Amino acid sequence: ISIEAIKQSDGSYMAFTDNGRNQTGSEVIAWAKKVEDLGAGEILLTSVDKEGTGEGIDYNLISQVCKSVNIPVIAHGGIGKPEDVEKVATDLPVSGVAISSILHYQAIKFSDKNANFDDEGNIEFLKNKRSISLINTSRISDIKKLLKENRIQIR
């Protein structure tokens, strides 16, 4: 199951849908436990606040969910460089790390500022290229090499 989490002003995390657009009214930890009870076999946990920023994973969120459930958790949102993948895989009890920005932001860095992203959802982010400077683009082969060198299992 995929859980999209947004941190609230009180420090809690609420579950959202539709790329963080729609509130569910469910607190993330409670929802993670419920989906496990309902038979989910794995959770893809996205920090909407960190997604696409390159600022690093939300360790608090990922750690809380991993401690709350007995099913595998895949961390997603915030990876800015290959070393972030290594750090998450080493420091947190996750079953995997989902990445995207470090693989494709090179194209956005050099795209036309007047490009029309209206159907993409996060329009202001894409048009302003906010935080793209924190993304260190890489190739899958380089990321795999780094992980293998550090004896981190890859699929």
Regions found by a protein language model. Give the residues of each.
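Active-site-adjacent beta->alpha loops and helix N-cap segments on the catalytic face
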Residues: 2-11, 51-66, 81-86, 106-114
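Short secondary-structure boundary segments
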Residues: 3-5, 47, 77-78, 100-102
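Conserved, mostly hydrophobic/aromatic
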Residues: 1, 35, 43, 65, ...
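Short loop-to-alpha-helix "cap/lid" segments that border enzyme active sites
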Residues: 22-39, 56-70, 79
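Catalytic cores of alpha/beta
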Residues: 60-99
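C-terminal helical cap(s) of enzyme catalytic domains, especially alpha/beta-barrels
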Residues: 89-155
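Hydrophobic alpha-helical segments typical of transmembrane helices
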Residues: 31, 61, 84, 139-142
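Conserved anion-binding
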Residues: 1-51
